[in-house]
């Protein structure tokens, strides 16, 4: 039996004025341009990833079922509850009393919660299950 995981949710604090420097033209993955040495602006990560503060939450990934989508154990998800669920979107779902993060696959008679790791099986959700699509994942923040 799979161990149940608990997600801990956090609210964004967009009032925080702790902006950090952002290289204005991006970081070159090839040869850098000397002309771009001093093009910098300030950015708030909360303001950059939060579009609807009242409906946005953060949660950490627990497990390996979504590694193929770039969601690794311990990554921080940005979740927007105001977005409509759509086929192919990655969503945080509450299924039969447990939270999970999976890719949505909407069929005519059911919803499939698709893992992005072949070691995990898709979960078919139908009228016999309790399903709440809690929010849509919009960004993932990770350590490198």
Residue ranges and their predicted role:
Residues 74-75, 89:
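Structural motif
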């Amino acid at each position: 039996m799979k161990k149940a995981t608990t997600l801990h949710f956090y609210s964004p604090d967009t009032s925080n004025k702790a902006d950090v420097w952002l290289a204005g033209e991006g970081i070159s993955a090839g040869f850098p341009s000397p002309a771009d040495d001093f093009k910098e602006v300030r950015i708030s990560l909360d303001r950059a990833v939060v579009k609807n503060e009242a409906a946005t939450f953060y949660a950490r990934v627990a497990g390996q079922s979504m590694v193929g989508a770039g969601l690794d154990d311990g990554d921080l998800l940005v979740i927007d509850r105001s977005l409509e669920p759509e086929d192919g979107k990655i969503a945080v779902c509450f299924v039969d009393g447990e939270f999970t993060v999976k890719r949505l696959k909407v069929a005519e008679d059911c919803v499939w919660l698709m893992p992005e790791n072949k070691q995990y099986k898709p979960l078919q959700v139908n009228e016999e299950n309790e399903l709440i699509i809690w929010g849509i994942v919009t960004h993932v923040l990770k350590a490198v």
